[in-house]
Amino acid sequence: MKVGFVGLGNMGSAMAHNLIKAGHTLTVYNHTRGRAEEFRPLGATVAETPGEAASGAEAFITMVADDRAVEGVIFGQGKVIESLPAGGVHICMCTISVALSHRLLAAHRGQKQHFIAAPVFGRPDAAAAAKLFIAVAGSAEQITRCQPLFDAMGQRTFVVGDDAPAASLVKVTGNFLITTVIESLGEAFALIRKSGVDPGKFLEVLTGSLFSSPVYRTYGGMIAADNFEPVGFSMPLGMKDNRLVLAAAEEAAVPMPMASLVRDRMLAATAQGLGDADWAAIARISLREAGL
């Protein structure tokens, strides 16, 4: 497929590489031009603007940081809403608010374009290995049309509904669950350490028995080692996603006390000098509260 791709950070860069490997034709754009230029030797076209990347594209992928960045690309100076051809599909693969997902769906329909929300679960190493999990919502016809793209980037695609905002909600709710696991692990390892038990042995028990999922293995390993480098998902992005799930919960009148707790943990981590760390560093708050 002819694909426009905007957002070549750690995740987007790996995803774009895999699309090229799979034989798709890419036109790329990144706010920091040097990241885009890295793709020129691979056969990609480097666009001057997001709108240029979307012009003539069958599919246009956004993998940027937040709602503001997506809005800038689609409605602002990027002007993708004007340049994506009728019949083209915008695939938003980043984590955005449910409200923005609704707005994008309506705006693209108004231009006779299509919109799919397809946020991903996985860190940069999973993106590089094409092992992402992709939650997709939108029209069945467009999802089928875009499946080769998803296959190039991920190990499994989950269709969660025919209304694009459903995937955005699944993503922010899934990220909420990850943060609750991180918080629980932080508390558990604080108890283990203060009681003199080997954190590595505790991790072995967890991941070798009932807690063998990637979330427990990845974050349990980081917390057991008290090592949060390299940063795979930063604290500011974690705080952004926490705000998104709390906003969705407020809209639906659903209390989420754990989300509020995690929000305070992230604020505490930021106040204590961990604002640039991986979001898993909230586990250090439990250590400090335990006097460790």
Model-derived regions, located:
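NAD(P)+-binding Rossmann beta1-loop-alpha1 motif at the extreme N-terminus of oxidoreductases
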Residues: 1-63, 88, 93, 124, ...
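Hydrophobic residues within alpha-helices
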Residues: 15-16, 35, 104, 149, ...
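Rossmann-fold NAD(P) dinucleotide-binding segment
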Residues: 50-114
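Hydrophobic beta-strand scaffold residues
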Residues: 26, 46, 115-116, 157, ...
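Rossmann-fold dinucleotide-binding core
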Residues: 95-176
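Helical "substrate-binding/catalytic lid" subdomain
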Residues: 164-290
